[in-house]
């Protein structure tokens, strides 16, 4: 931004502070720019004196403050003594006194009095030869006729407001009947035609910028009664009042509490209060076509009448965005459009606001278009996967190597205590090498194999089995998770009857095959104890305390002693110890049955 544009922007802020009677902001700007800027002039968009036409006119801060009735700012400017009260500027050659009279604000009498006391000339003429008293518009309401007479007397030379008010009180009062509009919706109060009221459908009052940021937001400066529906400005107590979307962060969504009657949050509410705040919001105004198009007869229409009047939309949110063809409108403040398309989302001051394609040219450079705004991508949905699917995947691990490793008793004794699988098996588990389950039979088959593997390991090494259960990836989320004791009890009852008798029969048949006997002798050398040394002795106390393990040793020892002497005709070892084992309760025979089963599988593998 160049130096000229920056100075123009700051002076526009000075004029805006004068119009709003913001004395503190006005003082800070004057001190920042220097006191000499207080008598400067800048362009101001508004109605020309004595005419309904709108346009840019050169105005000073004193003239703008007098026009809008900013009493405190006028008093401060005059008190500095750095301004010329009778200075005229603009194409109409108006002075501050002309602006004060034509503004018809509520403080017009006090403003005129301050100017007259500050040596303002009531006989000064503008470019059309009109004195300040000549630009007073005829008051169409008799309510303010007395005030108009006071203003005329002040301009005729009597600058004492108290004296004029005393003369006015001495005059007989005129009884005036005030017509009150009935509460019926179809009927309303009739007002005479007011030529001073602007046309809210044409000119600057019909532009998108004015509709979104000034319509029913800026206060009306007229002190007489007039038709509020024909006036684009807001009046005290008017239901059509809007909050400025640049100052109050609210959306175009209607407030549910306001619909019921009143909203407890007031101006701080994040939702729109009323139809004007909803449909004149920058995010929604003229983003749709009017059904009547160019034949629309509404005084204030919220929709576009032509396709070229449509304001662009955000593809992701559907709300209005800045139009690349529109720019700044100087009928508002220079900082008026530093917000984005939706009020609660503030954007940098360099971003162009949502303006219309037919907006007025701006002395300030345009900003970024909506194409440069960052695209808002909706977040991807993080939905939890199927528990059944995750349970099946955890069971689809290939246990072929682990099952093969169980064929050797030495591998069982050397298995690491910290992991239920070998290192290669754990790598496959972490890598996620899965195969899809084709049927429920595969699923349940995998479950049986996995459970059987854990049961066998629990028999050989209880500590290893407990570690594997605590680190199992399936234990938490599997649909088939059950109590381990219930699984052991149910399966032990089923296999005990089938395996115990077949174990005895296979053992008897094994003794009649010398080739198998020699191979079995080599493979079962480590079955006696953990250190590999066979213990053939059986003590009485050991038989009572370790009945199952001792009997298993005796069983192994019997085979070791029988197999080498098969050809000598020695008698077979006594296996009557199995009979009481089969008749024992389920809890007592559980471990020996599984030990026998493992032993039989070892024999089958060797064979």
Swiss-Prot record:
Q: Lineage of the source organism?
A: Eukaryota, Viridiplantae, Streptophyta, Embryophyta, Tracheophyta
Query: In which residue ranges is the amino acid composition biased (Polar residues)?
Result: 349-361
GO MF terms listed in the record are: DNA binding; DNA-binding transcription factor activity; RNA binding; zinc ion binding
Zinc fingers typed C3H1-type, residue spans: 254-276, 284-308
Q: Which GO terms describe its biological process?
A: regulation of DNA-templated transcription; translation
Classify the source by domain of life. Eukaryota
ANK repeats (start-end): 57-87, 92-124
The entry's protein name is Zinc finger CCCH domain-containing protein 66
Ranges of Acidic residues compositional bias? 161-178
Q: Which InterPro entries match?
A: Ankyrin_rpt, Ankyrin_rpt-contain_sf, Unkempt-like, Znf-CCCH_4, Znf_CCCH
The source organism is: Arabidopsis thaliana (Mouse-ear cress)
User: What SMART domains does its record include?
Assistant: ANK, ZnF_C3H1
Pfam families registered for this protein in UniProt = Ank_2, zf-CCCH_4, zf-CCCH_AtC3H23
- A GO term from the CC aspect: cytoplasmic stress granule
- Read off the SUPFAM superfamilies from this record: Ankyrin repeat
Q: Which residue ranges are recorded for the region named Disordered?
A: 161-193, 342-363
